[in-house]
Amino acid sequence: MITNSLLHQITYGREGKNWGFSMGLPKLEEIIDGVTQSTYTLVFSPTGTGKSSIALYSYIYKPLMEHLDDGNFKVTYFSLEMSAEMLYAKLLSMYIFEKYHIELSTKELLSRKKDYILSDENYEIVKQCLPWLHKVEEIVTVYDKSLSADSMYSLLMKELEKEGTFSETEGRKIYTPNNENLIHLVVIDHLSLARRTNGRTLKEEMDLISSYLVTLRNRCKISPLVIMQANRNSTAMDRRKEGLNNLRIDDTKDTGAPAQDSEIIISIFNPHREKLSSYRGYDIKSLGSNFRVVTVLKNRYGEADVEVGCAFYGKISYFAELPKPEDIYDYEKYNNPDWILDKKEDNVKMEDDVTNIRKPKFTL
């Protein structure tokens, strides 16, 4: 049975059906193969660094735009930090930027800025986006209430029963999906906000959530995306004194189970917050808080300890890969995301390779 299953996967791959979905970050895609079926990914960073934003941009928005109408993408998003409306507003902000070339933050869309009301013109744009949002709603299901391991498992089982059939074969529970091409992304944002139940500690609850996700990944080919906080403790201070500023796998907070269970671990690092003037040749004084280092710390299927320099525009939760530092001649242009819209006018040489700041980091 295993041999037949392996042959099926090889044949399936020869048809191009094992390819991952686009993430909007080509170099990162090349390293981790994009958003793929049956892959457990952990994303972590300190608070306010952009971990939820990269999840929304690279794991949801970009695949959505590629597979809005083909029925091959589904998202179950357990949002423990923001409401479903806020999450959709962030996706809308990205869409408006790409389609209308206008930067509208979620605060502006919701008229939450003091003395600010969304203009009639921009309100009309929002209404023009409603058909797109309705399509998104068919793909992205958001649960924004409290979550425990048991409630998560129950909700996911109900969703999976709609998408396929469970059966028993030779004492094994088998799941047969209605659509073999479907990538079902399951997002936990973020894990430390899980609700403790049945006398379990927070760590035990988090570990059980991760264990359930592994079970459903193996049986039903879901793709878990777990978001966690980083814990920069006293040992991290010692590392910074030695010039080792980026995150490590053991910087995850509250539990190490997701790091062990996952195939891919990605960290987001903000050198500006650490008061660095430069990082891997990038001028942080010029880029400021618009620069992020996206690091693949673990990759069960390929290369790890690889850094990718990215521009990040928090107003619209948007990421874009930067050229190599030696190819940047005008840092000022990266202070806003307009350069992304028309790369033909870029005054730097954009190279399509995956060697962007690929230097070994942990030389302890």
Could you describe each region identified by the protein language model?
Residues 2, 101-103, 130-133, 150, ...:
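C-terminal regions of RecA-like/P-loop NTPase motor modules
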Residues 8, 12, 23, 30, ...:
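Cytosolic-facing regulatory segments adjacent to core modules
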Residues 36-41, 73:
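Pre-Walker A (Motif I) flank of P-loop NTPase domains
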